[in-house]
Amino acid sequence: MLYKVSDLFDLTHTRAAELLEKCEYPHEVLPRIKPFILALGETLPISEFLHPSPTVWIARDAVVAPTACLGECIIIDHGAEVRHCAYIRGSALIGRDAVVGNSTELKNVILFDNVQVPHYNYVGDSVLGYRAHMGAGAVTSNVKGDRQPVVVHRGSERMETGLKKLGAMLGDYAEIGCGAVLNPGAVIGRGAQVYPLVSVRGTVPANCIHKGGSVVEKREGGTRRRGGYGTFLEPKKVPKKAVCDVKVNWIKTGSGPGHPRGREELESLGLE
């Protein structure tokens, strides 16, 4: 099944909850972002938000670098950080404690709380869920080369969106590696990971890893650098003596981690 809003996002971590609740599929929110921000901005208390221009609202405890460029129709929430030379073109709702880094460009987006797009990212016509992170240089491509409307698909399922501009939908805790390209209409499930330099089309299922040539499920016992979605177990603890015994055996037998016997010994300890 194609991912719905409820499959990707915990709506307690965004001011756009009311808007997203009205949408079954996440891409349906994109044409509604601008009017929603304008209406929401008028309700924000002046005791908490600065109002430097008619359509821009910035939380008083947010940090916006003097070299950042802000367009129109923008809300920057509490604790967010917009770093030097960031370019927020417009229609952007930036959540609490989010990070928008140097030379990052945003356009028609919702960033949930704690999202990080910290270095040289382009995020357009997209929604990034709670604690989603994009590595340096990772981008969302939001227009097809033939300029035709974008189709969202997962396996054999397809949905015509009617949108000529549609970037990516990142579920909560999605992790995108450096230099990755998320092609128009890409959907990254909750807790999913995309390796660096990978070009993603279609949908990456929740709690899976897109390695480029293959998509695999995350293993129990794996770790994540940042807080995770679902059940992620702590790494298996292996007695130091057991590891030392394996290494001594490698020396005696001339094997090692690249040798079939060596790999078997590592697997017996629950390691690779």
Pin down the residues of each PLM region:
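Short gly/ser/thr-rich secondary-structure transition/capping motifs
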Residues: L44-E48, D61, E157-M159
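Terminal amphipathic alpha-helical/low-complexity segments used for targeting or macromolecular assembly
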Residues: M1-T55, G191, L197, A206-C208, ...
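ABC ATPase A-loop
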Residues: W57, I75, L93, M169, ...
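Glycine-rich active-site/cofactor-binding loop and its immediate structural neighborhood
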Residues: R60-S103
